C-alpha cells in the first residue's frame, strides 16, 4: 500500500482521470519498460522519436482536473446556450428521441464503442440495424437500393452530383440545381463542383426543362415547403441522357409520392428527424438511395446479405471494391467514416414506430401546419398552397415579425425582408400553433380550424404505395420488445465494452463515460444550427476553447472544426492548399505526391480537389523513399502542389527524415500535408506544425476520444499554418460564432456569400458535428498537459511491449531506430503461409474464438497484421491478446509439424459458433474443446460469434442489401 499523502492537494487527486484513462498503472509501466529495455517513459520516448522534431517544452495547457470539476465547467458553458422554440427548418427539425433508444443505443458503449464492421462475423448486430436503415430508406424513397449512411444531406447531394456525372449518358458538364434546394446544400455543391470542372446552373424546375445537363437536383418538398410535381421534368432530363437526383424528407415520404415512383434515379436526404436532435448541425445520418443499375457507383458503405460456412444467412460489407481503401484515387468517393451510430438510432426509431406510427407522426405534423396556415389566411396573411410541414409566409414585414418572435422566445426562418418560413415537426404542439398565429395577429381556435380545414397535400402527389412491410418494422412496438431486440443485436457484436480492438491506424482508445455525458444534454442537443447567434454562446465558447487546445497540441496556427470526418478534413486541407496556390497566380500547380503506403482516403481526396496523384516509393525499411520524393518534386517542380505523408508512417515508425522531406517539397513550391491519423503518437511529444508541415487533419474520433460508433460519427478538424488560414472552409453567415451576423443574413436563393478565392463549405453545418465536440473538450480538460503526454508515451510503450513479447513468435516487419516501433506494429505473417498454408485472414478469424477483434488486415502491407493497442489497455488485456497470438502460433506450428491437418484445422474453420461446437455430429479432425476453448481462461468468459466464416465471394456475386426474408433463416440457426 502506498504511503498516505501528506497534503490536501495530494488528497484532492486532480489527476484521477489520467489514471482511469491510461490502462497500466505505474508498477505495470515499470515492468513493461523492463521488457522493452528502458528505465523510464522519457528514456524510451527519446529512443523512439527523432530529436529534431521533439517538442522542447510541455504543452501550454492547464493541469488535469477531476471528472466532477470538468463536468461542472462544461455545464456552465452549456448553460450559456439558450434553448428556445425553433421553427426554422431548412433541413433540421425537432424530434423526440425515444428514451429506450437514448439509453440503450446512444448511451450504450456496446453500440458507440464498436468499430466499422469490416470484420463481418463479430458485427452481425449492427449490420442488421444498418440493413434495417437501408431498407427503411429504400422503401420510403421508392428506390431499389440504399447505402448505410453518408455524412449529411449536403455532402450526400454532392455525392449524387458526382454519381450522376459518372453514370449519365449525357456528355454535358452542367449540373442543374433547383433554386429551392436548401441553401447550405447549394453552397456545398459549389465547393465540390468547381475543382472537378462541373458547371452549376441554378434555376427553377421550368428552366430545368430546357437545360442541357448531365443531371438535375430537386428538393422535394422544397426548402420553402412546396410540394412539386416533377414527373414531366424527370422525363425531359432522361430524354437527353441525364439523371434526376432528389433531396427529400423521409417523414414527408410517408404521405407524399415516393421519388422513385415519378422518375428519380438518385435520392438523398437526412434521417435526423427520426429521433436525432439538432445538435447545432450534427451529427446526423444522411443517406443515398438509387436505382439498382447504379449500385456499383454508389459512395459509402453497403451492407449486403451473404452466407456463412454453414450456408446460413450472414451480413457483410458488400461491393467494397468501390471504396477508397481499395480503389484509392479511382474510388467513387473519399468517404470512410460515415454516421453509423446515428443511422442505427434512426433505424430503431422506424422499428419502434413502424409504418403506422411514422404515418401518425407525419399526419399530426401536417395537420398542425394546415391548421396554422388556415389561421394565418383568415387574418389575411399569404401562405403557400401545397406543403407538408413548412409554411412560406409572404408579403409581411419580416423584421417586425422576427422581433415579435424573438420577444416570445420563438425562432423563425429568415428568407427576405417580406417573407419568413415556419416549419412544424414532431415536437410541435397546439400551444405552439396558437403562439405562432398570434405573431401575425391571427387567432387559432384549434378544434374549430381542425374541423374546417382540409389537408394541404396536392391530390396527385399523395402516397398510395405501402412501405416498411418487413416484420422487423411491425413487431417491436412495445418497449420490452424493442429493448430485447436491441439487446439481442448488441450481444452479437464485439465492441470495446468487451475487449480491446487492436486495429492499427484506428486508435480504439477509451471513450470515457464522463466525456460522453454532456452529449445528451438539451443545452447542446436542442440548438438549431441556424439559430440566432446569441442563443449559441455556449457553443461559441466551447469551439473557441477546443480550437485553441488543438492549435497547442499540433503547433499550427488555426483550426476549422467544420469537417465531419477525417476524409473531409483531408479534403478541406487540400482545398486550402489549392486556394493558396491560386491566390498566388499558380493555379497550374496540380500534382500531389502520395507515398504508396498512404491511407486510401489520401489519393481519393486529392482527386476530388482536381489534383493529379503521383505515387512515390517506400524503401526496404518501410520508410518513404526520400530520394524518390526529391526526384519527383524536382521533376514536377512547376506543377507541384503538395505532398501528403502520414507521420508516424503507416508502417508504424518515426521516420528520421521528415524535416528534410518538408524542406525538399517547399524548395519546389509545394505544400506539405501531414495526415493526422497517427496523432496519438505525437500529442505532447512533437508538433507537425513546428517541423515544417503546412496542414493536417486530425481525427477527434481517434486521438481525442470521440467514439467510432461502429463507423461514425467522427470529426476531422483541419489545422493549418497562418498562410493557409484564410483558405479554411467558410461558415454560413448566421452561424453567428465568428460572423456576428443576425439571422436575417442567412443565405437564400442562388447567390453565393463566399468571396473570390475563399473556400466554400465542406459540411452542411458551419461547425459540422458540433454536438460531439464536448467529448474532446472533456478529454483534454481532464487529462491536462502532463496527462496528454503520458498518454502518448504509454501508447508507444504498449505497442513496443506487444512487439517485444511476440518477437519470438512473429516478426515485426518494420522498426525505427533502436529497434523500436511507434504506437503500432506490423506483424509479418506471410512466411507462415508458405510453411503452413495459414494466412493473415485465418489468424484474424481465429482471434474471434479468443474473443478479440482482429488487427488491421493487409494494410499497409498485404498479408500482414497491424496492431495498435492504445494507451487505454491494461497490461492484463495486452497479455491476454499476446497469449492468444502465441497460442495461435502454436496451432500453426502444429500444422507445420503435421500434428494438425493443413486444411481441417481450427484456423481454417474459424470462427466456431456455439451451434457448431454443440452439434450432435462433429466432423473435424481436431477436438471441439480446441475449437471453442483454446485457452483455459475462455471457459470463464467466452464470446460466441453468431455466424461462421462469411463467404465474401458469394456476397458480391449475389448482391442483396435489404432485410432478409424471414423464411431465409434455417430452423436450426440460433437467433
From Swiss-Prot:
E.C. code: 1.4.4.2
Pfam assignment, any one: GcvP2_C
Modified residues (N6-(pyridoxal phosphate)lysine): 702
EC supergroup of this enzyme: oxidoreductase
Cofactor(s) the record lists: pyridoxal 5'-phosphate
GO cellular component: cytosol; glycine cleavage complex
Molecular function GO labels: glycine binding; glycine dehydrogenase (decarboxylating) activity; pyridoxal phosphate binding
Keyword entries, A-Z: Oxidoreductase, Pyridoxal phosphate
InterPro entries attached to this UniProt entry: GcvP, GDC-P_C, GDC-P_N, GDC_P, PyrdxlP-dep_Trfase, PyrdxlP-dep_Trfase_major, PyrdxlP-dep_Trfase_small
A GO biological-process term: glycine decarboxylation via glycine cleavage system
CDD domains: GDC-P
HAMAP family: GcvP
PANTHER family listed in its UniProt record: GLYCINE DEHYDROGENASE (DECARBOXYLATING), MITOCHONDRIAL, GLYCINE DEHYDROGENASE, DECARBOXYLATING
Quaternary structure (record): The glycine cleavage system is composed of four proteins: P, T, L and H.
Similarity remark: Belongs to the GcvP family.
Identification of the protein by name: Glycine dehydrogenase (decarboxylating)
Organism: Xanthomonas campestris pv. campestris (strain 8004)
Amino acid at each position: 500500500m502506498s504511503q498516505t499523502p501528506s497534503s490536501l492537494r495530494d488528497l484532492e487527486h486532480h489527476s484521477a482521470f489520467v489514471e482511469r484513462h491510461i490502462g497500466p498503472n505505474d508498477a505495470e509501466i515499470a515492468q513493461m519498460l523492463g521488457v522493452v529495455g528502458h528505465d523510464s517513459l522519457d528514456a524510451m520516448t527519446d529512443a523512439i522519436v527523432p530529436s529534431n522534431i521533439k517538442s522542447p517544452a510541455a504543452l501550454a495547457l492547464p493541469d488535469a482536473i477531476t471528472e466532477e470539476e470538468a463536468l461542472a465547467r462544461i455545464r456552465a458553458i452549456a448553460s450559456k446556450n439558450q434553448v428556445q422554440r425553433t421553427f426554422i427548418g431548412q433541413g433540421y427539425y425537432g424530434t423526440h428521441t425515444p428514451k429506450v433508444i437514448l439509453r440503450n443505443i446512444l448511451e450504450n458503449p456496446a453500440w458507440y464503442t464498436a468499430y466499422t464492421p469490416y470484420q463481418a462475423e463479430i458485427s452481425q448486430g449492427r449490420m442488421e440495424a444498418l440493413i434495417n436503415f437501408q431498407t427503411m430508406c429504400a422503401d420510403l424513397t421508392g428506390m431499389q437500393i440504399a447505402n448505410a449512411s453518408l455524412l449529411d444531406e449536403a455532402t450526400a447531394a454532392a455525392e449524387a452530383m458526382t454519381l450522376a456525372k459518372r453514370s449519365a449518358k449525357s456528355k454535358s458538364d452542367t449540373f442543374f440545381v433547383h433554386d429551392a434546394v436548401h441553401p447550405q446544400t447549394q453552397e456545398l455543391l459549389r465547393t465540390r463542383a468547381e475543382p472537378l470542372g462541373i458547371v452549376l446552373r441554378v434555376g427553377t424546375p421550368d428552366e430545368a426543362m430546357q437545360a442541357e445537363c448531365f443531371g438535375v437536383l430537386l428538393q422535394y418538398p422544397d426548402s420553402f415547403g412546396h410540394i412539386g410535381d416533377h414527373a414531366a421534368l424527370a422525363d425531359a432530363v432522361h430524354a437527353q441522357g441525364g439523371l434526376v437526383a432528389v433531396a427529400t424528407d423521409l417523414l414527408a415520404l410517408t404521405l407524399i409520392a415516393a421519388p422513385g415512383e415519378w422518375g428519380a434515379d438518385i435520392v438523398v436526404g437526412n434521417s435526423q428527424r427520426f429521433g436525432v436532435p439538432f445538435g447545432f448541425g450534427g451529427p446526423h445520418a444522411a443517406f443515398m438511395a438509387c436505382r439498382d443499375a447504379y449500385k456499383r457507383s454508389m459512395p459509402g458503405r453497403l451492407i449486403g446479405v451473404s452466407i456463412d460456412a454453414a450456408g446460413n444467412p450472414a451480413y457483410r460489407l458488400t461491393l467494397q471494391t468501390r471504396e477508397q481503401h481499395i480503389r484509392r484515387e479511382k474510388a467513387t468517393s473519399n468517404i470512410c467514416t460515415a454516421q453509423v451510430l446515428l443511422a442505427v438510432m434512426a433505424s430503431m426509431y422506424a422499428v419502434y414506430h413502424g409504418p403506422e406510427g411514422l404515418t401518425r407522426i407525419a399526419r399530426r405534423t401536417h395537420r398542425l401546419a394546415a391548421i396554422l396556415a388556415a389561421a394565418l389566411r383568415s387574418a389575411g396573411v399569404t401562405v403557400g398552397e401545397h406543403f407538408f410541414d413548412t409554411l412560406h409566409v409572404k408579403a409581411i414585414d419580416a423584421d417586425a415579425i422576427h422581433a415579435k418572435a424573438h420577444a416570445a422566445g420563438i425562432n423563425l426562418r429568415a428568407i427576405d425582408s417580406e417573407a419568413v418560413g415556419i416549419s412544424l415537426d414532431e415536437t410541435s404542439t397546439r400551444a405552439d400553433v396558437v403562439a405562432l398565429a398570434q405573431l401575425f395577429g391571427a387567432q387559432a381556435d384549434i378544434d374549430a380550424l381542425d374541423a374546417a380545414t382540409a389537408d394541404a397535400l396536392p391530390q396527385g402527389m399523395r402516397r398510395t404505395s405501402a412501405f416498411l412491410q418487413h416484420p422487423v418494422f411491425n413487431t417491436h412496438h412495445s418497449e420490452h420488445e424493442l429493448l430485447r431486440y436491441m439487446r439481442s443485436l448488441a450481444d452479437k457484436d464485439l465492441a470495446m465494452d468487451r475487449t480491446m480492438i487492436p486495429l492499427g491506424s484506428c486508435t480504439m482508445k477509451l471513450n470515457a463515460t464522463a466525456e460522453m455525458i454532456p452529449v445528451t444534454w438539451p443545452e447542446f442537443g436542442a440548438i438549431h444550427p441556424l439559430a440566432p447567434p446569441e442563443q449559441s454562446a455556449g457553443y461559441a465558447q466551447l469551439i473557441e476553447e477546443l480550437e485553441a487546445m488543438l492549435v497547442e497540441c499540433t503547433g499550427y496556427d488555426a483550426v476549422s472544426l467544420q469537417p465531419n470526418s477525417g476524409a473531409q478534413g483531408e479534403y478541406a486541407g487540400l482545398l486550402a492548399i489549392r486556394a493558396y496556390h491560386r491566390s498566388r497566380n499558380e493555379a497550374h500547380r496540380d500534382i500531389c505526391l502520395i507515398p504508396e503506403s498512404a491511407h486510401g482516403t489520401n489519393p481519393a481526396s486529392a482527386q476530388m480537389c482536381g489534383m493529379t496523384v503521383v505515387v512515390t516509393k517506400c524503401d526496404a525499411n518501410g520508410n518513404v523513399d526520400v530520394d524518390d520524393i526529391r526526384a519527383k518534386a524536382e521533376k514536377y517542380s512547376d506543377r507541384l502542389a503538395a505532398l501528403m505523408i502520414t507521420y508516424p508512417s503507416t508502417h508504424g515508425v518515426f521516420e528520421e527524415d521528415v524535416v528534410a522531406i518538408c524542406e525538399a517539397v517547399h524548395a519546389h513550391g509545394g505544400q506539405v500535408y501531414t495526415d493526422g491519423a497517427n496523432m496519438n503518437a505525437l500529442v505532447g511529444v512533437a508538433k507537425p506544425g513546428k517541423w515544417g508541415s503546412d496542414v493536417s487533419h486530425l481525427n477527434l474520433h481517434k486521438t481525442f476520444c470521440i467514439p467510432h460508433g461502429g463507423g461514425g460519427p467522427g470529426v476531422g478538424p483541419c489545422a493549418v499554418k497562418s498562410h493557409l488560414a484564410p483558405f479554411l472552409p467558410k461558415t454560413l453567415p448566421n452561424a453567428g460564432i465568428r460572423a456576428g451576423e443576425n439571422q436575417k443574413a442567412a443565405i437564400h436563393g442562388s447567390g453565393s456569400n463566399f468571396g473570390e478565392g475563399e473556400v466554400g463549405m465542406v459540411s452542411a453545418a458551419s461547425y459540422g458535428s458540433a454536438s460531439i465536440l464536448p467529448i474532446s473538450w472533456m478529454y483534454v480538460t481532464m487529462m491536462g498537459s502532463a496527462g496528454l503526454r503520458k498518454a502518448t508515451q504509454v501508447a508507444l510503450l504498449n505497442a513496443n511491449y506487444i512487439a517485444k513479447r511476440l518477437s519470438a513468435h512473429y516478426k515485426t516487419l518494420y522498426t525505427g531506430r533502436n529497434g523500436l516501433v511507434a504506437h503500432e506494429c506490423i506483424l509479418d505473417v506471410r512466411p507462415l503461409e508458405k510453411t503452413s498454408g495459414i494466412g493473415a485472414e485465418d489468424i484474424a478469424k481465429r482471434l474471434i474464438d479468443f474473443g478479440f477483434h482482429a488487427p488491421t488486415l493487409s494494410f499497409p502491407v498485404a498479408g500482414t497484421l497491424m496492431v495498435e493497442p492504445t494507451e487505454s489497455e491494461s497490461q492484463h488485456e495486452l497479455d491476454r491478446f499476446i497469449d492468444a497470438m502465441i497460442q495461435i502460433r502454436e496451432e500453426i506450428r502444429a500444422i507445420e509439424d503435421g500434428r494438425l491437418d493443413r486444411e481441417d484445422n481450427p484456423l481454417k474453420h474459424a470462427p466456431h459458433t456455439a451451434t457448431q461446437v454443440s452439434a450432435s455430429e462433429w466432423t473435424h479432425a481436431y477436438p471441439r474443446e480446441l475449437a471453442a476453448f483454446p485457452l483455459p481462461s475462455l471457459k470463464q468468459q467466452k464470446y460466441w460469434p453468431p455466424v461462421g466464416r462469411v463467404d465474401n465471394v458469394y456476397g458480391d456475386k449475389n448482391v442483396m442489401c435489404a432485410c432478409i426474408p424471414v423464411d431465409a433463416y434455417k430452423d436450426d440457426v440460433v437467433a
